Every structure is written in C-alpha cells, then in structure tokens.
A protein has these predicted regions:
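Charged, low-complexity intrinsically disordered segments and flexible loops
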Residues: 35-38, 98-99, 136
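Compact DNA/chromatin-associated regulatory and scaffold domains in nuclear/nucleoid proteins
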Residues: 96-99, 116-120
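Short, hydrophobic-biased segments on the C-terminal half of alpha helices
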Residues: 59, 112-116
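Long, low-complexity, charged/polar intrinsically disordered regions in eukaryotic proteins
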Residues: 2-80
Length: 138
C-alpha cells in the first residue's frame, strides 16, 4: 500500500491511518508522558490505548515467527483465533504477560490498529485485502 499517512504522531499532530482493508480511518499518537508510554488510538468517538512497547515487541515476535501471520482482530469480549497477532497480544506468553490493550472493555482490536502504524514506520509488511489480512516482519 502506498504510504499516505498524515501526521507526526504527536497529540497535536496524530498519525492518520487506515485499517488494513482500507475501509476505515483512525488516528494514533504516542504519549510518552504516560508511565509506561502509550499509543492512543482514536476511532470515531472511541479512544483505545495500547502499550507503546508493542512497536518493538511485535516486529521481534514476527521475526521469530519467520513468516506471514494472520492478524485475527477481535473485540475484547470475543476469543482471538490461535496463532494470530490478536491472540499473541493477549497471551500470558507475550513479553508483557497479557494484554497490550490498556482500557478495560476496549483492549481488543489490537491487530486492526497497531499493524498499520508498524507498516508506516517501516517495521512490517501488511496485506490489504477485504479480510483475512496477514503481516510479517521487514
């Protein structure tokens, strides 16, 4: 996908990104004043928060995985498909020993919103199909 992302990733000038299928727009910025630092994702009127360390942890995990991995995005109250980025982002086996999402009730959908930012930052390759998209490390 051609990188048409606007913004610099600050609260005043957030990145404006699109979901992997390209059907929805959202904004995201990094909040380094939070402890630990967070990614703040605005989707319409909904604000999601994820641990910013995922920007390093996801590419590291994908390099170890060694191939394409399905995104598997799912809401918090729905189970994530095994072997997907979404399942990894909730797993007690990941580097944070659980959820990367920080806002209770809104911790899911990690695989919908974080990979487009990682793609923009040049850390991953991301598919942009209507559904069943995958990602791999660069």
């Amino acid at each position: 996908m051609t990188d048409k992302v606007k913004g610099t990733g600050t609260a005043d000038d957030p990145w404006v990104l699109r979901t992997p299928p390209g059907t929805s727009e959202f904004s995201m910025h990094r909040d380094d004043s939070a402890d630990p630092p967070e990614l703040v994702c605005q989707v319409g009127s909904t604000k999601l928060r994820y641990l910013a360390r995922c920007l390093d942890d996801v590419p590291t995990m994908l390099k170890k995985h060694g191939d394409w991995m399905e995104l598997g995005s799912a809401d918090e109250n729905k189970p994530a498909k095994d072997g997907t980025v979404e399942a990894w982002a909730r797993s007690p086996e990941n580097p944070v020993k659980g959820w990367y999402g920080l806002r209770k009730g809104y911790r899911g959908r990690f695989a919908m919103y974080v990979p487009p930012l990682l793609e923009h930052l040049g850390r991953v390759e991301l598919e942009h199909n209507a559904k069943n998209n995958r990602v791999r490390a660069r």
